[in-house]
């Protein structure tokens, strides 16, 4: 019996994860139809993707670019319907337009559409880690009510998901997330003070966008992933470990109470995890070759240096504090990373700004979306204001 084609929405289509998702989808035209493409501001790139994939709908986040998108689609003779803005995207994601959503919008901007997909009971391939960090309790609650199927796309959480064959953690003693260590593994603080945005974006093993590359360099990416694992798998902090693994071949390990440990290994390529999410529980080709252990015959592990790279420690502290503290962490980090990429602050000012926000703002219960968004806005305001009080980059 032929299975029905799955209609897939790719949110953040012009980014690195969006490109990887579309690559996998294009390999399986009889199984998947790209029904919706969404991007933030890169309207020309979105138009090019629409020409290639012929989606039913296209959404540009920046409403001022709506006319450009609409006219570009008409000029190309495409039947794709144009939309703009966060509300339009959330409405489309919740509609019958799609049954599968690749949530790859970077930052808190992806929260509304991710929540909309969860509320509508979609299969949600979650690559937007900020949604879990900012509103993890709300997101998981909505998914539980609607029956939405959340499959994490981060390589570490996807590895845990594969080892467990679900998000059920019966019999789990602990999980270990691996980190490449970023491009500055082994650097001291004196060396880090001179790091430039270009250097920070040169990740040794993964191909990623600017923001996540900087997060990897500061180890904030791993801190956010610890919080993600807490929400996705219902594990407390003491059952979530982190090890630096520079080869990026072992993506996570799951240790069970009987002494067994399962690990997932693959080449560092997001197409693998996206293929898992799209076809689960079946397997489909991703375009990624298998792992040749004779070629990659060395696996190294070490503890992370949380004194030099304090973002990982700050993330754990925020998770332990709970409530709105992770939302503060996330918003302050987004502002700090943006300022660093613009050359307005130095690399070491990123954790300093985050710590400033965490110590300045009070903790509230994270029980409503309105509370979280208010805290997010206030955190961005005080972090913006604090930029002038920190030294300029060397």
Swiss-Prot record:
Mn(2+) binds at residues 154, 156, 225. Its EC number is 1.1.1.267. 1-deoxy-D-xylulose 5-phosphate binds at residues 129, 155-156, 180, 203, 216, 221-222, 225. InterPro entries: DXP_reductoisomerase (IPR003821), DXP_reductoisomerase_C (IPR013644), DXP_reductoisomerase_N (IPR013512), DXPR_C (IPR026877), DXPR_C_sf (IPR036169), NAD(P)-bd_dom_sf (IPR036291). It catalyses: 2-C-methyl-D-erythritol 4-phosphate + NADP(+) = 1-deoxy-D-xylulose 5-phosphate + NADPH + H(+). Pathway: Isoprenoid biosynthesis; isopentenyl diphosphate biosynthesis via DXP pathway; isopentenyl diphosphate from 1-deoxy-D-xylulose 5-phosphate: step 1/6. Disulfide bonds: none annotated. Belongs to the DXR family. Catalyzes the NADPH-dependent rearrangement and reduction of 1-deoxy-D-xylulose-5-phosphate (DXP) to 2-C-methyl-D-erythritol 4-phosphate (MEP). NCBIfam families: Dxr (TIGR00243). This is 1-deoxy-D-xylulose 5-phosphate reductoisomerase. It comes from Xylella fastidiosa (strain M12).
